[in-house]
Amino acid sequence: MASWPELIGALLARESLDSARTAWAMDQIMAGAATPAQIAGFAVALRAKGETPAEIGGLIAAMRAHAAPLRIPDEIRARAVDTCGTGGDRSNTVNLSTMAALVVAGAGVPVIKHGNRAASSACGSADLLAELGVAIDLPPAGVEACLRAAGIAFCFARIFHPAMRHVGGPRAEIGVPTAFNILGPLTNPAEPGAQAVGVADARLAPVVAQVLADRGTRALVFRGDDGLDELTPTTTSTIWVIPGGQPSAAGEAAGQTAAPPRREQFDPRDVGIHVPDIAVLRGADAPHNAAVTRALLAGEPGPVRDTVLLAAAASLVAAAGPTDAAITEQIAAALPRAAHAIDSGAAAAVLDRWTDASQAAAAAAAIAR
């Protein structure tokens, strides 16, 4: 039987925990059985020791066990991609990954985006979508209805992971990034087959990549070398390339992990994109960011479009399954498809269908209550 003194003591002794023990800790937290001091002590000790993929895997397993169920048909789920990143880079850019989600859906790839309201910025993905007219607090049936009608859906973390409310206070009071900061992109309740994940914390980016590789997810994990949790348009980015493929049951039972993801450097200038100053991507409140989003969908050129195209191209590469080719070549090949989704009006049409479908689903849910 695990205990908090045992787990925190082991971490302070710089001993890594197996997934069963971190799953126990997360189960206690999700059940409301852990005190704020225990939650904070565990998170800080884990960070000080350095998180491993197995430890993160245990946290994810317990968090999923407490989540509201969402069952997306396999033929859709397997093709779908999530563009959710970790946030926390303190750059206060506009909602690049959310805009990229609309572009990817406009290119014909199903998108199941996991997200929440703002934590470290003025406008989170949920804030932006609500401002654009999307009903965000939908039950599972509403999420699936949006996916079928518009090719895109939003899983609001507060709806599907209500037990995470126990983490909010200690996390805010600690004030430094911990493992809790990376769980959002790794706990999408729909479990899409592909992900494009920006990670702000340089320590945790390779850990996130290995977790996704062990899961068999097709993915690109990236971090701008300027600290942005995006493919930055200002300088180089580091990308971890994960082709995906289901791990074998025998391998999982033996505790084997997938091969380490391939690490590459990406320079946006190699695909014809360069933004000299990140300041031109600064966002503000939800009305401002919504106006920027609508301008993008209307075809407005400029640094926001260029940066969103990079993000959308990365998501398209992840959805298709990264190959052995250099990642720069793969992103370059996907850029025209992303641009066409905007210029043809397809991405804007996705937003129109999504707002209609989500509002209808919200009305149906209200009647059912």
UniProtKB/Swiss-Prot annotation:
Mg(2+) 1 binds at residues 97, 230. Binds 2 magnesium ions per monomer. Keywords: Amino-acid biosynthesis, Aromatic amino acid biosynthesis, Glycosyltransferase, Magnesium, Metal-binding, Transferase, Tryptophan biosynthesis. It catalyses: N-(5-phospho-beta-D-ribosyl)anthranilate + diphosphate = 5-phospho-alpha-D-ribose 1-diphosphate + anthranilate. The keyword Amino-acid biosynthesis applies. SUPFAM superfamilies: Nucleoside phosphorylase/phosphoribosyltransferase catalytic domain (SSF52418), Nucleoside phosphorylase/phosphoribosyltransferase N-terminal domain (SSF47648). GO terms for molecular function: anthranilate phosphoribosyltransferase activity; magnesium ion binding. GO terms for biological process: L-tryptophan biosynthetic process. Mg(2+) 2 binds at residues 229-230. Pathway: Amino-acid biosynthesis; L-tryptophan biosynthesis; L-tryptophan from chorismate: step 2/5. Its EC number is 2.4.2.18. Signal peptide: none annotated. Homodimer. Catalyzes the transfer of the phosphoribosyl group of 5-phosphorylribose-1-pyrophosphate (PRPP) to anthranilate to yield N-(5'-phosphoribosyl)-anthranilate (PRA). This is Anthranilate phosphoribosyltransferase. The gene is trpD.
